[in-house]
């Protein structure tokens, strides 16, 4: 019956195990739940309806500081929002992992600020070369990394 088939699929789906291994001999990644970040760049996201890019924007002037945290084995992570509202910003990141990460504030064609943060250290950068209505996002790059922080 349909119920039996769906139960079999449900039981089978719970036995699937996804394993990722790091082959360069580095320490295992500290798994931090992704909060406010994902593997999808705001510049690459396409709406399923309509022809314009999504307008998912966080106005820091009106909504305040945006917090984020995440971890990845090797893929870049991006903030879920583009940011706007001010003419100067500060990005603060704590590297909670065992490998260095590079944090960059940018839009598709321009980089506003960037820093490389060693394992277990904190880092920040500020930039003011931006108009209050210009949108930017933050990208996190590295191998086997985890972090938490905010932009304000």
Where are the predicted features?
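Extracellular and analogous surface-interaction loops
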Residues: 78-90, 127-132
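Short beta-strands within extracellular/lumenal beta-sheet-rich domains
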Residues: 65-84, 146
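A glycine-anchored, Pro-Gly-centered beta-turn/N-cap motif
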Residues: 64, 87, 121, 132-135
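Short, exposed beta-strand-loop hairpins at the edges of beta-sheets
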Residues: 116-117, 126-152
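Short, surface-exposed beta-strand/strand-loop-strand elements in extracellular ectodomains
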Residues: 97-115, 151-152
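N-terminal prepro-regions of secreted/extracellular proteins
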Residues: 1-69
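Exposed beta-strand and adjacent loop surfaces of beta-rich binding modules
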Residues: 88-90, 98-102, 135, 146-148
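Asparagine-centered strand-capping/turn motif at beta-strand->loop junctions
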Residues: 93-97, 140-142
């Amino acid at each position: 019956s349909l119920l039996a088939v769906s139960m079999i699929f449900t039981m089978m789906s719970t036995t699937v195990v996804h394993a990722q291994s790091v082959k360069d001999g580095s320490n295992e990644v500290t798994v931090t739940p992704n909060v406010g970040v994902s593997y999808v760049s705001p510049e690459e996201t396409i709406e399923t309806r309509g022809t314009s890019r999504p307008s998912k924007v966080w106005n820091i002037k009106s909504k305040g500081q945006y917090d984020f945290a995440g971890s990845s084995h090797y893929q870049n992570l991006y903030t879920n929002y583009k940011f706007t509202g001010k003419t100067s910003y500060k990005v603060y990141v704590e590297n909670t992992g065992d490998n260095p990460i590079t944090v960059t504030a940018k839009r598709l064609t321009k980089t506003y600020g960037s820093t490389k943060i060693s394992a277990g250290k904190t880092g920040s950068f500020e930039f003011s070369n931006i108009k209050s209505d210009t949108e930017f996002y933050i990208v996190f790059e590295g191998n086997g990394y985890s972090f938490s922080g905010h932009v304000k």
